[in-house]
Structure formats: C-alpha cells, structure tokens
Amino acid sequence: MNPQLHNIILPIYMDYQATTPLDPRVMEAMLPYFTTKFGNPHSRSHSFGWEAENAVEEARSRVAKLIGADAKEIIFTSGATESNNLAIKGIAKFYGNKKNHIITVVSEHKCVLDACRHLEQEGIKITYLPINPNGIIDLEILKESITNQTMLVSVMAVNNEIGVIQPLKEIGKICRERGVFLHSDIAQGFGKIPINVNEFNIDLASISGHKIYGPKGVGALYVRKKPRIRVTPLINGGGQERGMRSGTLPTPLIVGLGMAAEIAYNEMEKDNKHVSYLFDRFLNNIKQKISEVYLNGDKDQRYKGNLNLSFAGVEGESIILAIKDLAVSSGSACTSASLEPSYVLRSMGIGEELAHTSIRFGIGKFTTEQEIDYAVDLICSKIDKLRELSPLWEMMQQGIDLKKIKWASH
C-alpha cells in the first residue's frame, strides 16, 4: 500500500459531509471582493457600493436558480445553523399566538433538534417523528401527527450522518393539503440532488456554503413569497434582507456561495455520476474482502457521497486511529467529540454494539479512483488486524449473542 505507487497524497480527505474543499473557481471569483471591490453593498451613493450590490444580487439569483426559487426569496445568513434557527424560531414567534405545534424528526441535525427543544421550554409542543430501520420517515405517521394546531413540519433533505434522502415531494404534498408550512434543512442536498422548492411545496429551506465547495461562514434561507411566509428575525438592526436578517452582508463570501451554486447547477449531473461510480467501487470492494460490514441507511434512496458503514466486532474510534491516512468521522462533525453512539443510528434501531462500530466515509467531486482503491486496501488490512485482537469478534465467531452478555461495567 505505497501511496507513491497510487500517485496520491496522504492523508486522503473523506469527510465531505463535515465540509468540502473550496473550488478554485470559487476562490478566484471571491478574491477581487477582498481587495479592490471592497465596497459596502448597502452604500447607495457611490460606485463602490453599487458594484458590491450588483455582485450580491447576481449571487442571490444563482442560489435561487439552483432550487427553482425567485431571487427575492433568498435571505443570506452566516450558515445553515443560523438559517435553521431563523426558520424554526422565526415561524414559532410569528405564528405562535395562533398555533402551538411543530413536527420534526428524531434524526434531524443537532441545530434543528436544539432549536425545537428551546421552543419546548417556551411552551411550543414538539412531535419528534420516528424513522424506519432504513432511516426514512413513515408518511402515515406524519399524516397522523398533524393537528389543527400544527404550524410547521421540519424535515431535512439528506441526512448528514447516513446520507438517506427523505421523500420531500410527498411530505410537501401532505403539508400543502393540510395547510402547514414545510421547512427543510437542505444543507447536505443543495447542489447534490435535484431540489425544486415549488415542485416539492417547500416553504423554507436552509442552505450552507461550505458543503458545496464554497466558503465557510455564509449560508442562506429560502423564504417563500407566494403565498407569503413571515418569520420574526433573530437579529435586529438596519433591516437588511427584507428585514429578516440585519447586518452588513459579507460580499466576498456571498459571491463565493453564488459561484459555488452556479458550478453545481452546471456540473451536478457529472459530479453525481463520478460520486456514484466511486461509491459502488468502494462498497463492493470492501464487501468482497471482509465480512460483517453493514451499510447504514437505505441503499437506493440516498446521496451516494455518503457511506456510513458498521464493521462488526471493532470499535469505531479504534478504526479511526488505525486508518489515520484517511480523514473520516465516526458521526456528525458537530457531535463526534462525544463518545456516545450516534443518535441517528440508535433511532434506526441499530444496537449499541453496531452503532459504536460505525464510520462515515465521504466521497466528493475531488475524490479519485486511486484514493478509493488505496482506502479500501488500508481499511480491509486494518479491520482484519483489529478483529484478530478483538475479544468481541472472537465471541461473535463462536456464535455468542453479544446482546445477552451482562457486562460488569461499561
């Protein structure tokens, strides 16, 4: 496994769900707005301001085009965490005197769940929908959960840990029929899978720049204008962004997000073919070489840039240490500092012992076939060695049911 023979540079980046490298074309588009084109886009009295404003509006149109929205429906924010908070808390504050119920899903991103918990403390009722063992929600349970007090349903497009795609079109149809707003955290799906806010009846959608080869520190919230959706702002000030998000806009970052959206619009199909091919190559080769490897989440209804695998009989943390040539994660980058097993995997009904063995491998547009082959060889050789040392693996081979063992301490 000589990296020179594979013509690759170590470590290999395989954590594309946590963040993505900046596309060089995005960097090129941003640079002038850090140097000569430094105007404030809200300065209306001179050419420096007009130039910056034009750049911001072009970026707004590019972001809107990627999801079939109108440019006026795009509100720039600092990222998807802010967008999720603005959508959920903003709707609750504006409509909370008429309705008091929100529905979300147990496997949502931490910032959605935490925003909902915050609202619970303020008296809003929250329903957390369960997920099936494949990671996807049951539409019948959603229908049954909607009441005449429900103001919002919040369901993500693509899960950040397991990559499954929720049936947003069907969810949107249900919400529209019942007169309930639909918010979706589309950070992991924006620019990667086709999303059309009108076709899917999405009313609010959260976007992140750094998940699509754009800069960190910038994102957007799509807020439908027809019929008009109102949100109470989190930040008050000069009334920028239709009064929903005050503060001077960071022109270079917004230009970067716009350029990243434009590239994704033109190259999504090509990127998806590349990523799908590498996904199949990676998964098939690993499964041929080692046994007891499980793909977490639905195999077909998923974004193929995300492979969450469980390797029976080996701890996830020990795998990460063993394959240090690969930059990977044992869960969401926001929660992987905790040694608790993934709440997403647990909510799918995966047992603690398998949840502890999971690793998330991210494949992106810059990943090469050589890197995938090197990764497969490295993983398989290290898993074999770790299993030789693992008493759990030995017990499994002897047919002992690990669930029935009573451990002295944990």
Curated annotation (Swiss-Prot):
Keywords: 2Fe-2S, Cytoplasm, Iron, Iron-sulfur, Metal-binding, Pyridoxal phosphate, Transferase. It is an enzyme of class 2 (transferase). Pathway: Cofactor biosynthesis; iron-sulfur cluster biosynthesis. Its cofactor is pyridoxal 5'-phosphate. It is found in: Cytoplasm. GO terms for biological process: [2Fe-2S] cluster assembly. Pfam families: Aminotran_5. [2Fe-2S] cluster binds at C334. One of its GO terms (molecular function) is cysteine desulfurase activity. One of its GO terms (cellular component) is L-cysteine desulfurase complex. Pyridoxal 5'-phosphate binds at A80, T81, N160, Q188, S208, G209, H210, T248. It catalyses: (sulfur carrier)-H + L-cysteine = (sulfur carrier)-SH + L-alanine. The modification N6-(pyridoxal phosphate)lysine is found at K211. The active site is at C334. Belongs to the class-V pyridoxal-phosphate-dependent aminotransferase family. NifS/IscS subfamily. Master enzyme that delivers sulfur to a number of partners involved in Fe-S cluster assembly, tRNA modification or cofactor biosynthesis. Catalyzes the removal of elemental sulfur atoms from cysteine to produce alanine. Functions as a sulfur delivery protein for Fe-S cluster synthesis onto IscU, an Fe-S scaffold assembly protein, as well as other S acceptor proteins. This is Cysteine desulfurase IscS. It comes from Rickettsia canadensis (strain McKiel).
